UniProtKB/Swiss-Prot annotation:
Gene: rpsL
Lineage: Bacteria, Bacillati, Actinomycetota, Actinomycetes, Bifidobacteriales
Name under which the protein is recorded: Small ribosomal subunit protein uS12
Methyltransferase is among the record's keywords: no
CDD domains according to UniProt: Ribosomal_S12 (cd03368)
HAMAP family (alphabetical): Ribosomal_uS12_B
């Protein structure tokens, strides 16, 4: 326990915050190539077939990324943009694919909350 005098002289040292998205290497987004596109099941108590992809990033690291929205056009060798953000019920999935960027099409017929899904305004 430091004395008041020691705290006045040195102060407290803040612990460095650990990044949750190490594969992005400090970038907000990274480009990558899909190596495998598949479905996986969430952990209890949920039940579904979640769409995910293994992506080799431009940083050289291979990660598992979630494909949000209903329906997608991704296959092996598709070029995608990856952002951080985990999926709570899929263990090991800590990244999201950005819809409407590079080879990924936006979600079709989406009317509300379009921004996150790369959907254009309906005419």
């Amino acid at each position: 326990m430091p004395t008041i005098e020691q705290l006045v002289r040195k102060g407290r040292q803040a612990k460095p915050k650990k990044s949750k998205t190490l594969a992005l290497k400090g970038s907000p987004l990274r480009r990558g190539v899909c190596t495998r596109v598949y479905t996986t099941t969430p952990r209890k108590p949920n039940s579904a077939l979640r769409k995910v992809a293994r992506v080799r990033l431009s940083s050289g690291i291979e990660v598992t990324a979630y494909i949000p929205g209903e329906g997608h056009n991704l296959q092996e060798h598709s070029i995608v943009l990856v952002r951080g953000g985990r999926v709570k019920d899929l263990p090991g999935v800590r990244y999201h694919i950005v819809r409407g960027a590079l080879d990924t099409q936006g979600v079709k017929d989406r009317k509300q909350g379009r921004s996150l899904y790369g959907a254009k305004k309906a005419k």
